[in-house]
Amino acid sequence: MREPSAELIIDIDRIRNNIIYLKSLLKPDTKFMAILKANAYGHGLNIISKSIDDLVDGYGLVRLEEATSVRKYTSKKILLMQGVYSEDDFKIAYDNKFDLVVHNKNQLFAFENSDINIWLKVNTGMN
């Protein structure tokens, strides 16, 4: 019996066309952020982000390693959705000008004397 095989074909033109279409539905001054967590959902973080960089205003990433990888070739806004949990990670985020998601009051207080941009995660019961 043959092993089943799988093939993943990434059509960059379709991804780009989808972004262009979605943006056409928005007001012209609306910002558009690409969420590319988990290696762009398994499609290849660097391949996808380099291919759409001219179409997006920024990126939402989970892991610090992914964010630093994308920062190597873009100066656009990068939101580190996981946040940071150590002083070393905070320094990397600060030096790379990442925005951070704040998940709890301890993180909020830790960043209160910093000029780093933060986004507040507010859980309304839907996670």
Sequence positions of predicted segments:
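Structured alpha-helical segments in the cores of large, soluble enzyme domains
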Residues: 18-25
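Active-site-proximal beta-alpha core segment in soluble small-molecule metabolic enzymes
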Residues: 2, 6-10, 14-17, 30-127
